[in-house]
Amino acid sequence: SECLVGSEMCIRDRMEACVDGKLDAIDLQFEDNAAVCVVLASDGYPVAYEKGFEITGLEKFEGKEDYFCFHAGTKFNEAGKIVTNGGRVLGITATGADLKEARKKAYEATEWVNFANKYMRHDIGKAIDEA
């Protein structure tokens, strides 16, 4: 994606302003919401893990405005299927009115995606729920 979650401005425009030394001349605009990202990793990461497991459920992100799936350790296999190809496989991100809502939605979206050795932490943003 060329735009940042929570930003109303294209990341390319920000990068060009940085390169041109004109970051102070642009109006950085952000949405009034929160975002939480939960990484789906390969079990065993970072020490030892298997690759090549087919990833299913990615189509569930289509048409969902507040949900994002960022690919990291993925690739297409010979059959054209998306498979795992690294330790940090996907970044499942959701936005909400506040951090509690964003966290709830991000963890909800992690259940949409499946692959054989899927692993994730369950404590991302946990302090938010305890506050």
Model segments located where?
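Single conserved hydrophobic/aromatic residue that forms the stacking wall/gate
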Residues: 1-6, 10-11
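Peripheral (often C-terminal) accessory segments that flank ATP-dependent C-N-forming ligase machineries
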Residues: 17-131
